[in-house]
């Protein structure tokens, strides 16, 4: 029987290619990976504290959380694995907007974002497990500028009623009803959804994998 690419062993006793593990419970990130033909071998939720530290700025926050997610899951793996972690932070200036868990928070976020520019910072991190010593730790941070038009109270009410703000940083989902109110985006659309696809593909292309198996993406 022919072994799968992630389990076929080379002369070193290690597989030609490690398992790819997505350290996220987000269906959006899984869907984005599948969009470019990448299907993780495992999807594991990273149970970490995502609260910003006192005085922590948006960029360092996104980077720290993405690293912690990847490192938390990588530390639990004893097999040859490469763990992909990501985190998205929405900010207005130096202010980090929360993930909206209730209507009051979502409404406050939308009122703040109405008619103004904000930034979406998405960090993506690759961390090898101890069982894949030749893996290369690497990461990218992608910054995207987004501008909402000026929202009326009725439009905010309609967005709240849609319900796709739940659990979203900044209280909206760009792939949902909010798209009708976004006047301009500068940067990576997929990063705003939750995973910058170009940068993620670049990181994966840079990983050392065996020639017989090839990488995850051309």
UniProtKB/Swiss-Prot annotation:
Pfam family, one: Maf
Organism the protein comes from: Gluconobacter oxydans (strain 621H)
Polar residues: compositionally biased ranges: 1-10
EC number of the protein: 3.6.1.9
Catalytic reaction equation(s): dTTP + H2O = dTMP + diphosphate + H(+); UTP + H2O = UMP + diphosphate + H(+)
HAMAP family named among the record's database cross-references: Maf
One of the GO biological process terms: nucleotide metabolic process
Keywords: Cytoplasm, Hydrolase, Nucleotide metabolism
Active-site residues, record numbering mapped to chain: 87
Broad class of enzyme this protein falls into: hydrolase
Region span, Disordered: 1-20
PANTHER family: BIFUNCTIONAL DTTP/UTP PYROPHOSPHATASE/METHYLTRANSFERASE PROTEIN-RELATED, BIFUNCTIONAL DTTP_UTP PYROPHOSPHATASE_METHYLTRANSFERASE PROTEIN-RELATED
One cellular-component annotation, GO: cytoplasm
Main location: cytoplasm
Molecular function as annotated in GO: dTTP diphosphatase activity; UTP diphosphatase activity
Family statement: Belongs to the Maf family. YhdE subfamily.
Residues flagged as site, Important for substrate specificity: 28, 88, 175
Record protein name field: dTTP/UTP pyrophosphatase
